[in-house]
Swiss-Prot record:
<dbReference type="GO" id="GO:0005634">
    <property type="term" value="C:nucleus"/>
</dbReference>
<keyword id="KW-0017">Alkaloid metabolism</keyword>
<dbReference type="InterPro" id="IPR023213">
    <property type="entry name" value="CAT-like_dom_sf"/>
</dbReference>
<dbReference type="GO" id="GO:0009820">
    <property type="term" value="P:alkaloid metabolic process"/>
</dbReference>
<keyword id="KW-0539">Nucleus</keyword>
<protein>
    <recommendedName>
        <fullName>Loline biosynthesis cluster 2 transcription factor lolU2</fullName>
    </recommendedName>
</protein>
<keyword id="KW-0805">Transcription regulation</keyword>
<keyword id="KW-0804">Transcription</keyword>
<comment type="function">
    <text>Transcriptional regulator that may regulate the expression of the loline biosynthesis cluster 1, one of the 2 clusters involved in the biosynthesis of loline alkaloids, potent insecticidal agents composed of a pyrrolizidine ring system and an uncommon ether bridge linking carbons 2 and 7.</text>
</comment>
Amino acid sequence: MVSAGNHAIVALGWTTSEDGTLTRPLDLVENWLLARIQRANTPPGREAEGLTYKLKLRLPQDIDDPIPYLRRAWLVFRYVQPLIGAIYPPYSERDETGRYLVTVPPMDPEEWLRLSFHVNQGSQAVFRDVDDAGMIFRPRPTAMAYWFPPSSTLVIRSTHLRFDAVGLYKATNTFMLGLESVFRLGLDANLDCYTTDVKQPSLPPGIDYILGFPPQETPVSHRVGCAVDELMRHWHHGLYSLSLPVREGSEDAAPANTQHMVTLFDEPTLEAIVAGCKELGVSVSAAVHASIVRVWASFPQQQHTGARNMLIPLVANLRPLLDPKWVVPDYALSLCIFVVPFCLTGGFEDLTQRLGAVYSRDLSALPSDSAGDPVSFLELLPLYDSQEAAFLGSLPVAGCPPFRVPNLSSLGVLERYLARAYGQKGAQAPVCEIEDVALVNATTDPTIEFQLFTFRGTMRLYLYYNDAYYTEDFLASVMEMVRESLLQELGLDGSESSEGLDPKEA
């Protein structure tokens, strides 16, 4: 077996046992997400906040059987990114003080591949097809890889505790570089001979250590307290938030399967959208988010009598706050996001402009003190985390409508994080390519999640939902309304919109 500590740089905060197992307590952001998972209404055998990631690959035609190469690349990935094999709660233990731990066992190559890499075909098939892989997320101790030969698709499944979306795409680049290297060097090279973008495998510290959070008992300054109070006011004002009607009789139903649909914007349409947004002085993300809000507000007969506001959960990327030495591929497999609440009040006129103003701000400095000066997340996260957890744990509040506002995660152009092709030299054909990507978030409540990104010149807007609460037909019409709202508000012809919606596309 290969201990992570034998070949990787191990940061402060990790403890090594006699057999080479490494552990550290969950950091503040991991504990924040774990609390959200534990609050979820999840049936036994399923997990909230699970990620199912689909990579449709084009591999060398002269390789008759790509499976050994994919297995080897998955092993290389584990070697250079030890955290892909990390064990998180509920499978990891607690320390003597009761804190949850992240555990990285020594790497046994054969055991790692036996447990975590599966070929989905014949009697060994776990899923019916690629679409089926995203419907039910059953928890596993480590990340899992499933190869679907008919569609040449690699499906990676993991708890969200292991990485966020940006980290996942960064990690994809590492995996693809390793795969190209395996095709180039063959199956028998030593693990440290294969090349990726990871210069030295490492186990980075928890984000608490990097950001220098003070001990829990440290007194909180008045300016930090005011900034946290401002964020919490957004949560409280957003209690009376707009929502979509769920299917009749499903208010108290247990969650069922995660489903998804996607609407595509081809390159000419995307160029027109970008031009329209530039003319308005807003980002594409703000325009899409405004369209979602408009559609939600178009169901007035379904709203609670007090629902006048719209709570917008914004995803803040903490990576810009990290020391530059940690903003590297080695830190891809880490949770570096935080949800910031922003409540839209006072009606929906000039919605795009107001949302655009929020999106144009640095979300890491969105909260402000009593003088209006921004307060960094570095200062307020510890206090805000505890207050947000207490608030969300108090829901539902009597007399308030159900709390199920839509989330939008906007990832921009994925080519910032990964390439379309790998191993291409000059006019030669690339060794391997990513033809398409898709990411499905497991949903276990009536909250609808959107994800927006562009890859290979096509913008995709995904919608994820749990089919215990909504029908496909209803949400297909909602997605069409969002699309039409976006195009019409930007002065674009929406006549082709129905062709862009594909509920079944992976």
